[in-house]
Amino acid sequence: MKLKFELKKKNGNARRGQLIFERGTVQTPAFMPVGTYGTVKGMTPEEVKETGAQILLGNTFHLWLRPGQEVMKMHGDLHDFMNWQGPILTDSGGFQVFSLGDIRKITEEGVHFRNPVNGDKIFMDAEKSMEIQKDLGSDIVMIFDECTPYPATHDEAKKSMEMSLRWAKRSRDHFDKLENPNNLFGIVQGGVYEDLRDVSVKGLTEIGFDGYAVGGLAVGEPKEDMHRVLEHTCPQLPEDKPRYLMGVGKPEDLVEGVRRGIDMFDCVMPTRNARNGHLFVTGGVIKIRNAAHKTDTTPLDPHCDCYTCKNYSKSYLHHLDRCNEILGARLNTIHNLRYYQRLMESIRKAIDEDRFDQFVAEFYARRNREVPPLQKDKA
C-alpha cells in the first residue's frame, strides 16, 4: 500500500507529521531501531514494541545472504518471518556492499563481491536489490546507490553521485516493473559538496519517489559538515514527502536533524552501545561497568519509565555487565531503546506545543553544552 504522509505542524524547520501505512501509523519525527538479521539484537518484537518503536529497519544485504530469498518466501515475508506486524523499512544493501572494501568491484552494472559468509562470488545490482526487497515485503524500499566515502574529492564525489542517479532510475524502473505496491525512497548523495547535493536532489525529484533520504553522512565527516549539508539540502526536498537521514545517530544528531527538517532516523547506536555498557540518560551517558556504580542502588534514570529503570539498580546492571550475563545486555538494550523513543516523543510534543527551540535549549543545558548554531545564525 502507498503510504500517506501528513505534515501536521512546523516549528521553525522542525516538522511534525505522520506516516500512514496499511500496517499502522508512524508518528514523526520517528526513530527506527535496526534489526539487521531480522531481529533487534536480544529483543523479542513485543519487547521492541513496548519501548515505543513504531517501525523497524531490516538489512537487505544480510537477509539475502542468510537466510536467503527462498526461506523468506516460505514464511510469507520478513514481517511473518520475524513476527513483527508493524511497518518495516529495508536499506538496499548498497552500504554493506561498499563496506566490503577489497573484496568487491564496482562497475556501471553493479557490484561484484565475495560473500563474506562463505567466500562465493556473487553480484548485486539495482534490479536484484528491488527483487530482494519485494520478497522481504518491505513497506519502504530504498534504491540501490553508492554511498560516497569520506574523504572524497569533488570529482570522486561527482562520479559517485552521478552513478547513484543512474542506479536510482534503474531502481525506479524495476520497482515499477515488479508492480511492487509498496513505497520507494530515493537517496540524495554528493558527499560534503552542496553543488553536488543540488544535482542529486534535482535528478531524484525528476524521477519521482515516495520519500527522500539523505545518505552519505555520518561516514567520518566533521559534524559541522553534516549540519551544513543537511541545512542546505532539506529545504530543497519536496515538502509533502517524508525525509530520512540514514544511519544517524547520537541523541544530539537526532535533535540537530529535526532542527533541519528531518522526519526519520535509524542507527545501531542504542543497541550496540547497550551491549557495551554505554547507557543513554537525561544528562548524557552512563558507563555502567565503571566501579563507581558497584554500590549505587538508584535506577539508571529517574525520568525513565522503561522496564529496566522501574525494576533494577545501577548496582545490579553493573554486576550483570561485570559477569558478562546475557540479561545485562538485554536490560541495557530495553533502556537505550526506550530512551531513544522517549526522546522522539519529547521532540514531537515540543513541536506540537510550539516550543521546540525551548526544548533544544533545555536538551543541551542538561548536557552542559552550548546549542550548535544554525547556518543562518552564523551569517
UniProtKB/Swiss-Prot annotation:
InterPro entries: ArchSynthase1/Queuine_TRR, TGT, TGT-like_sf, tRNA_ribo_trans-like. Its cofactor is Zn(2+). The keyword NAD does not apply. Keywords: Glycosyltransferase, Metal-binding, Queuosine biosynthesis, Transferase, tRNA processing, Zinc. One of its GO terms (biological process) is queuosine biosynthetic process. One of its GO terms (molecular function) is tRNA-guanosine(34) queuine transglycosylase activity. The keyword Metal-binding applies. Residues 247-253, 271-275 are annotated as: RNA binding. It is an enzyme of class 2 (transferase). GO terms for cellular component: cytoplasm; cytosol. Binds 1 zinc ion per subunit. The active site is at residues 91, 266. It catalyses: 7-aminomethyl-7-carbaguanine + guanosine(34) in tRNA = 7-aminomethyl-7-carbaguanosine(34) in tRNA + guanine. It comes from the Bacteria. Coiled coil: none annotated. Substrate binds at residues 91-95, 145, 189, 216. Its EC number is 2.4.2.29. HAMAP family: Q_tRNA_Tgt. Belongs to the queuine tRNA-ribosyltransferase family. Homodimer. Within each dimer, one monomer is responsible for RNA recognition and catalysis, while the other monomer binds to the replacement base PreQ1. NCBIfam families: Q_tRNA_tgt (TIGR00430), tgt_general (TIGR00449). Catalyzes the base-exchange of a guanine (G) residue with the queuine precursor 7-aminomethyl-7-deazaguanine (PreQ1) at position 34 (anticodon wobble position) in tRNAs with GU(N) anticodons (tRNA-Asp, -Asn, -His and -Tyr). Catalysis occurs through a double-displacement mechanism. The nucleophile active site attacks the C1' of nucleotide 34 to detach the guanine base from the RNA, forming a covalent enzyme-RNA intermediate. The proton acceptor active site deprotonates the incoming PreQ1, allowing a nucleophilic attack on the C1' of the ribose to form the product. This is Queuine tRNA-ribosyltransferase. It comes from Vibrio cholerae serotype O1 (strain ATCC 39315 / El Tor Inaba N16961). The gene is tgt.
